[in-house]
């Protein structure tokens, strides 16, 4: 890279390692709440100025009400029998991260697609910052192209880079990792 390098990791510069266990407790309780499909009282985990920052299709939500009205409720309406399975969680001070999948049934409208009744796997990554026992920020990446593909809509029109390999349709599952046995 030529020229000056961009500043790296500035959001975690003042991280407090002593907060790790408190952060773990908040995130684990919040994930349990989401798995229990709590809406009315889920606010106990989020700060007043909570921000939820997602990729295209998810959007940016400011505050719990906007998160619930423009993410949590529509998501639950589109997908029933949903369970969240974090395949890995990492905790470091005020920060937590997870990746995993939600397994669900497409039972309501989703991006203009009427319910199909198909079981889908929704892969995601979450990064949270917890301050004073509340989630203040949540960065989210949801693999909507994969969900749409499972519902019969290839947003890449067959030109996705997975087609550059000898085995383009392989379905990776973490339980297939050789060191997991």
Please tell me what each predicted stretch does.
Residues 1-181:
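C-terminal and inter-domain tail/linker signature
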């Amino acid at each position: 890279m030529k020229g000056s390098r961009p500043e790296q990791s500035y959001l975690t510069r003042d991280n407090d390692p002593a907060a790790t266990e408190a952060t773990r407790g908040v995130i684990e309780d919040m994930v349990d709440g989401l798995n229990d499909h709590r809406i009315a009282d889920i606010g106990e985990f989020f700060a007043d100025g909570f921000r939820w920052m997602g990729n295209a299709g998810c959007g940016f939500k400011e505050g719990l009400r906007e998160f619930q009205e423009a993410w949590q409720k529509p998501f639950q309406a589109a997908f029933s029998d949903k369970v969240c399975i974090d395949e890995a969680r990492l905790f470091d001070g005020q920060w937590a991260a997870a990746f995993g999948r939600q397994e669900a049934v497409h039972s309501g409208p989703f991006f203009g697609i009427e319910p199909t009744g198909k079981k889908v796997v929704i892969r995601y990554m979450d990064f949270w910052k917890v301050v004073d026992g509340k989630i203040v920020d949540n960065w989210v990446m949801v693999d909507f192209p994969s969900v749409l593909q499972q519902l019969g809509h290839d947003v890449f029109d067959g030109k996705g880079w997975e087609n550059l390999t000898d085995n383009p349709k392989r379905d990776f599952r973490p339980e297939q990792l050789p060191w997991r046995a």
